[in-house]
Amino acid sequence: VVDSRAVVFIDVLGFASLTEQYTLELEQIKVADRPLSVESLNMILMRRENPLTQVFTAFHRSLEAVIDLAKMKHLVTAVTFSDSAFIATAHLYDAASIAIQLMHYLLPQRVPVRIGIGYGSFSALRFRSDVTVEGGDHAAHFLGTGVVRSNAAESCGIKGLRILLHPSAIQHLGE
């Protein structure tokens, strides 16, 4: 039996276009991943980042901060990849709080996101990463109706920066 969860799906809008238009600055992204380093402080002060680097690093920094805060209050399972993430919590109120907080963090940084929240099953089965000199094999095995419904809410066709609820979540608003 899989417990039902409120699942948040976050997607950065326009990320494919940024990836096509701008050079991937891996060194800058690696530096941004070490927030207290001298290089990271220099990068912040110089603000020479291209939009792809800025959006990617701001998204992941903000996402990590919001998840860390949420984990202090309740159980959270988060799966992040590229320009999107799924976050599962036990209660809709917690999921909505995460979505609102993330939107508050990202808007001033000009990182456009649309967020969908669904309610249903969620199971994180397996995560693995095998890195060798020749390459790597990475897998994130997770699934459930909460995953499908949160994605459906986000991609329902309504344009703009929004937090959208799937019908499955509406009955849990008072909880």
Regions picked out by a protein language model, each given a short descriptive name:
Residues 88-175:
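Catalytic beta-strand-to-alpha-helix segment of the class III nucleotidyl cyclase homology domain
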Residues 1-101, 108, 112:
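Catalytic NTP-binding/metal-coordinating core of nucleotidyl cyclase/transferase enzymes
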